[in-house]
């Protein structure tokens, strides 16, 4: 995933992180963006990366790694001071209390600070732009349908992206929302991602209606450079806390 959306994500958040500032990343995954943020704030600042399982977060001399569950642990437990930037990517749609978590994050910002929430959802799924095979489009549609069905069964809310902007405004933030996507040829990161995902959750895809042979056939197609996918839309919600006066 990092290879697919890190360039976009870093382009969004990097201008919002001041040198020597305070940066908090929630659900940091491997910490690929958090490490860049740590470089930006430097020794004079503070960069914190959290997750419920931090074993995949790569170490960095200026990055503090903390085990933290956003649904149960107050943000103030991480540090009582306010933050210049707080970021979460592909996290909120998975959380059961997602709608109630925005306001506390807005409250944890310094005046002029930013909350960045990025996610994928049920709107803006990827699709096949070109393929030398007749079945690629149908197979990819089957994959997307089975994937979304599995995610729903696991508690993921694909409609979250339709509420995020409104919830951030209601939390007192000045919000700008935009999307980003690009095309990917077979064997490139954007095609390797569904291949990897289909391997990780193969049994779940089968349980939700995709034939095993169809999964294998789709993987073969996505390894062909002549196949071109349009990637999922990445939704970026950027909220700024107003400066009083």
Report each predicted region and the residues it spans.
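Conserved alpha-helix/loop element of class I SAM-dependent methyltransferases that forms part
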Residues: 3-21, 36
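Class I SAM-dependent methyltransferase SAM/SAH-binding core
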Residues: 22-76
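A short glycine-rich, Lys/Arg-flanked "PGG" loop and its adjoining helix->strand segment in the class I
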Residues: 99-114
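Residues lining the SAM
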Residues: 84-92, 118
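Conserved catalytic/acceptor-binding region of the Class I
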Residues: 116-188
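Helix-to-beta-strand junctions that scaffold the AdoMet/dcAdoMet cofactor pocket
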Residues: 18, 42, 95-96, 109-111
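Conserved Class I S-adenosyl-L-methionine
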Residues: 157-162, 174-245
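A short acidic, Gly/Pro-enriched loop at the edge of an enzyme's catalytic core
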Residues: 75-86
